[in-house]
Amino acid sequence: MTSEDVLAVFKEAGALLEGHFILSSGRRSSVFLQKALVFSRPDLSEKLCKALAARLAADFGKIDVVAGPAVGGIIPGYELARHLGARAIFAERVDGQLQFRRGFSIAAGERVLIAEDIVTTGLSFRETVEALAKLPGEVVGGACIIDRSGGRADVGCKLISLAQVNFPDYAPDDLPPELQKIEAIKPGSRGLA
C-alpha cells in the first residue's frame, strides 16, 4: 500500500479535510486528517492496519504487546495487535502524564511495539516511550498509519509508517496570506484524554 493509497482511504472516509486547522501541536495547517472518520469504519481500519502489520515483521520480529496512547493509539493498536497475534494495551493521561492503568502490565522480556494513528511532532509517541520505560518490557519500535512529519519527527524509537506525507504547517504568527483569511478550527483530541 502506497502513501497515495492510504490518502485515498482517508478521502473515501471523508477524512481528508481542507481549511485552516489548529493541530494538536499548536501549529497551523491547511490540511487535517480526521482519523476518527477512518477508524469509525472497521473495514477501513482493518485494511490499513493489516497492511501496516505486514511491514512490521521483517523489521521487528515477534511482538508480544502493542501499546498506544489514548485516544489516537487505541484502535490502531488493537487492530495491529490482532494481526500480529499480540495483546493490545493503552496509556491514558493522569494529571497530564501518560500511565498504563486498568490492570495493564508487561512482563520482563516481552517485546513491545508502540502504535499511533498519525505522527506529527512525535510528542505522544515520546510520552508513551517514557511511560513504557517504567515497565519491564523491551520497546522494539513504533508504528503509525501516517507520519505527517515526512520522517522528521523524533519519536524516541525506530518508526515504521504505512504512509509518509509532508503537508506544510506553520507557526500561528507566521501564516501564509491564504490561511490568514480563514477562521481556524481545532478538530484534534489532545487535552481531551
Swiss-Prot record:
PANTHER family assigned to the protein according to its UniProt record, in alphabetical order: OROTATE PHOSPHORIBOSYLTRANSFERASE, URIDINE 5'-MONOPHOSPHATE SYNTHASE
UniProt KW keywords: Glycosyltransferase, Magnesium, Pyrimidine biosynthesis, Transferase
Entry EC number(s): 2.4.2.10
GO MF annotations in UniProt: magnesium ion binding; orotate phosphoribosyltransferase activity
Pathway: Pyrimidine metabolism; UMP biosynthesis via de novo pathway; UMP from orotate: step 1/2
Role according to the record: Catalyzes the transfer of a ribosyl phosphate group from 5-phosphoribose 1-diphosphate to orotate, leading to the formation of orotidine monophosphate (OMP).
CC cofactor: Mg(2+)
Residues noted as binding orotate in the record, renumbered to the chain: T120, R148
Family listed: Belongs to the purine/pyrimidine phosphoribosyltransferase family. PyrE subfamily.
Domain of life: Bacteria
UniProt name for this protein: Orotate phosphoribosyltransferase
Enzyme superclass (EC): transferase
InterPro entries: OPRT, Orotate_PRibTrfase_bac, PRibTrfase_dom, PRTase-like
Record: residues binding 5-phospho-alpha-D-ribose 1-diphosphate: E116, D117, I118, V119, T120, T121, G122, L123, S124
Biological process, per Gene Ontology: 'de novo' UMP biosynthetic process; pyrimidine nucleobase biosynthetic process
NCBIfam families xrefs: pyrE_Therm
The reaction(s) this protein catalyses: orotidine 5'-phosphate + diphosphate = orotate + 5-phospho-alpha-D-ribose 1-diphosphate
Complex formation: Homodimer.
Pfam families with a match to the protein in the record: Pribosyltran
